[in-house]
């Protein structure tokens, strides 16, 4: 039986440049910091009265590298298969004008967030967990593209979007927009999140710093020598999903193939993940799909480096035993915030520079490991989006644990529990649209490759059922939240508590974290922080 291994690699370096404060400092600089905070509080109260703006109408795409929504013959992404150019197909009429379909985009984003929430419930063990739902769902989309029969039916439940051609087109466009370094480079027609719309000028003041916001997504599809892909499948994963295709000799030189794949991953995660494939590759392997996501961003409002100090964290609720000692960071400023008394939780956003992404932190009012797990079961993508839509900036003081989290998990078992077990079964699996006995033919149906794949799926013209079976889905994450930068003076957490901000948010009890790309609403990282790393 031929094997297909999905290796998903994520690295997130969430950084912030810093100003400094300590508990025992009450200098003139501290007082100046407090006065500035209170002035910003008044400013944010005024902004809150006009934070909802009209959503701009959809306009034609201006994104480079896409012509008619699918591809430009000069696009480097089309020259990744042994130097051979793949000509773009013509899109269906519905896409020929190149518009962002916000309805479909929002459904895709909701699907990613719902998947994250369901996966989190299946992984729940009372410990800290962190993963990238976007990376996992992205790989499932590539499997959906080549699936038929029961495999297609199971994978379709992740998205619940009947028009799969539109799904892939819009998802590919969202992933392209996700990687743009500035708001201006993103496809026109994606509105600002409401709370960002009220304060875009402020959040853009420091957005032009080079490297302030970096997202890089890479797909490497490594196939056995002589194993030929369906030309329609190959064309779509290159043109729509910008995948890199490489040929490896898993049978004759598995050690070399392993080295090359690990090197590819290390390159695209800037050496944060260097050994994704730790063991020998089985010689029966015919394909390995490696998905690497690299994210690095600086906070819009700097954390205060010298304020970082050991502090208590209470997994079972504030004031209870056991008590963990963690490195707690602190800062103050104007942050988007909302309290939902029906759900019994609060949400605060820590924006990154560039007006693009935000770390949203959701915490029960009286949080504990048990309360957070109960909240997770109550939450849905729609409820989370509703809370985000009702946020507005308020003067706040924030204490948040410094974290470096690593996670490695094989997802086969949990996927089977989620009802996605067919792709792992030699009997039930059908990925015959990826590669078939007829795959050497050249686009025999002609026209658009997405439409061709859909026609093959419906009519059964994709050839004999494939022996390709997913062996496992390996998911690795390296996630860092820290502070770094220049030294300056500010005040202490204790003293600032007395200055009367609107909000005091302390991450000293369990919380949920979402790193979200606001223009596309895609969740890059999702986690439950029940036990942050202990203070050194």
Curated annotation (Swiss-Prot):
Gene Ontology CC, one term: extracellular space
Induction trigger: Up-regulated by injury in larvae and adults.
Name of the gene this protein is made from: Spn28Dc
Query: Where in the cell does this protein reside?
Result: Secreted
- What does this gene product do? Serine protease inhibitor which is required for pupal viability and plays an essential role in regulating the melanization reaction. Inhibits spontaneous melanization and appears to be involved in the melanization immune response to physical wounding in larvae and adults. Acts by negatively regulating the Hayan-phenoloxidase (PPO1) cascade in the hemolymph and possibly the trachea. May function by controlling the initial release of the activated form of PPO1, phenoloxidase (PO) and thus maintains PO availability for processes such as wound response and pigmentation.
Q: Where would I find glycosylation on this chain? A: 355
What protein is this chain from? Serine protease inhibitor 28Dc
Family that this chain belongs to: Belongs to the serpin family.
Q: Which SUPFAM superfamilies does the annotation name?
A: Serpins (SSF56574)
- GO MF entries: serine-type endopeptidase inhibitor activity
Q: Which organism is it from?
A: Drosophila melanogaster (Fruit fly)
Q: Which GO terms describe its biological process?
A: immune system process; melanin biosynthetic process; negative regulation of melanization defense response; negative regulation of proteolysis; response to wounding
Does the record carry Secreted as a key word?
yes
What UniProt keywords are attached to this protein's entry?
Answer: Developmental protein, Glycoprotein, Immunity, Melanin biosynthesis, Protease inhibitor, Secreted, Serine protease inhibitor, Signal
Q: Name one Pfam family in it.
A: Serpin
Query: Could you say what a knockout of this gene produces?
Result: RNAi-mediated knockdown is often lethal at the pupal stage, with flies displaying small black or brown spots prior to death. A small percentage of adults survive when grown at 23 degrees Celsius to preclude pupal lethality. These adult escapers (then kept at 29 degrees Celsius) do not display melanotic areas until several hours after eclosion. These melanotic regions or spots are predominately in air-exposed parts of the body, such as those close to the cuticle, and the thoracic and abdominal spiracles. In the tracheae melanization occurs only in the trunk closest to the spiracle.
